[in-house]
């Protein structure tokens, strides 16, 4: 494990102004999300915290639950957004910049902008992936 560091706070030069009124959180579940189909994939995404979801309309990030049925592939692609895939359940193969990497529950995969990536569910249960994307 890496050396533990101390959190030093956030940069106070943020362009986001603190509002005068109390800011309330948005508390949602995957059932509150907005379903989305992706081209060339039989998997289903659910936009949970995302500009498209009026129940949790994030501005600078997106959290999407992605459900990939057994033996289904989400073909490789790339885009300008930065992402992190958190493998919550199941196992599969990710295609990352042309290389195949085995992934399973408990793994985190950080994808810089324009990094080619795809994922295949190689198991017999639904592969569940939490995707964090910025910008959404």
PLM features: residue spans?
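Short beta-strand His + acidic residue motifs that chelate non-heme Fe in jelly-roll/DSBH
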Residues: 74-76, 94-95, 111, 117-124
